[in-house]
Amino acid sequence: MNKLNSKRIDWLITLAPFIIIISLAGVLFAFPNESNTIISKVRYFFGDTVGIYYLIIGVAVLIVSIYLAISKYGDVVLGEPNEKPRYSFFGWGSMMFTCGLAADILFYSFAEWVMYATNPHIEELGSVAEWAGVFPLFHWSFIPWAFYLVLAVAFGFMLHVKKINRQRYSEACRPIIGKHADGILGRIIDLFALFALLAGTATTFSVATPLLAAIIVKLFGITITCAVYTYAVLHGFKGISFLAKLCIYLFFGLLLIVLLIGGQGKFIIENGFQSLGKMLQNFIELSTFTDPGRTSNFPQDWTIYYWAYWMVWSVAAPFFIGNISRGRTIKQTILGGYVFGVGSTIVSFVVLGNYGLGLQVSEKTDFISQYVADGDLYGLILNIIDTMPMANVILVITVLCMIAFYATSFDSIAYTAA
């Protein structure tokens, strides 16, 4: 059996991305200044020179998702024509939401409004209270989930209708590249996909893990993630489904506590409702804003960066979503994804983001000055939580929620990569 499994391992696809990443890490460590210069130029090229194409792709993929949902293709079942979904709507939505966002959503829900509040573009638009809560909803809602859902139904169709079990991007590209999917071109596509997957995973760890570590050290002084991760791996999709449901209960429990006992409930609801309205009212303008005069570089620094970020995560999350969507129609997958994915994301940013923003607007504390002074977002989030009643309880729930998010999302990635 081991010999059979070893023959199935594509060592080139498996090892090459790791070798490339280790080599790049060595170069970055040995030549930090030169590497920083090169990376800055690469970032400028993709964010500024060709950034418009990211915006165009974002709008296009949203339109495609809507078309697939409302057209005749929406009735196509991802599986046999009369097949029923394998998971309940709640279980399916929980897995999709947690695998698609990881623990980043908690970090950004608490802190992203502060970064916008210090951006010159906000001053061009109006007040911090009006706009700092709008952009998180825009950058984390419809277009990001459109990236996931369009590819998810494509991969689901490939896996469950065409019965093609090779979960590789080269296989997904076969209708376009034909027999070259089995050749050098297919290998190159798979190498790029796996490299992007590893890079995206590293980015996610680098963003939210310091917050997780800071909370754990403050509360316990130990790391407790290994047992949770091992449980999910050993129990496969059932383990992932259980962790996803647990994560959702913790997640919405956290939001409910902050909303009801944090003391900013009225502001959270009113400003959240207003921010959602502003986002929908200005959605087309926000989606196509390029800042051609480069007065603020806001779309280059934020919107284009985020669209690139979601594209990288589209290497893994859509395969997993497509896999668990067996038995659902294309319409159910897309619209259900928007309802559960976008809905949960918006609620998170509205509640957690507007809690801190409410304290800032009411001048009960000055988080913006703190961020400007030291740039420490992790310390800022801890300070935000410390202003809440039962702060230690909320810290415990937050850390458990982050662990569950990480375990679910990276287990799903492990299954996809395997």
Task: State the predicted function of each range.
Residues N2-K7, E34-F46, S65-R86, G133-H139, ...:
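Membrane-water interface regions at transmembrane-helix termini and the short interhelical loops
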Residues L4-K7, I39-Y54, S127-I143, L219-G221, ...:
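Membrane-interface segments at the starts/ends of alpha-helical transmembrane spans
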Residues N5-R8, L12, I19-F29, L62-S65, ...:
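Helix-loop-helix module between adjacent transmembrane segments
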Residues K7-A16, D75-S94, G265, E270-F273, ...:
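C-terminal membrane-solvent junction of multi-pass transporters and transport-like membrane proteins
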Residues G343-V350, V396-T416:
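C-terminal transmembrane helix pair
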